[in-house]
Amino acid sequence: MPVRMMHMPGIYKMLEIVGTSPTSFADATRAAVAEAAKTVRHMDWFDVVKENGRIVDGQVTEFQVTLKIGFKLER
């Protein structure tokens, strides 16, 4: 259990998602969190699990970020 959860009483769940962006890992992270926020409530933190990219004809064309998002379960 990540240390940052210790001060937040309750039960939490982890959701793993992948965000993509043509410009940066940071934009891919923001896009993933923004999309998850449309359907997941009570998100509290994220961990970057992995960063990948795509190369086409010698050029970086896509940044990919795998995130684990922690959110509190409702009662």
Question: Predicted regions span which residues?
Answer:
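Short glycine/proline-enriched loop/turn "hinge" motifs that connect secondary-structure elements
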Residues: 7-8, 59
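Short, well-ordered alpha-helical segments
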Residues: 9-45
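Charge-dense, low-complexity polyampholytic segments
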Residues: 41-55
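A cross-kingdom feature marking charged/low-complexity
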Residues: 51-75
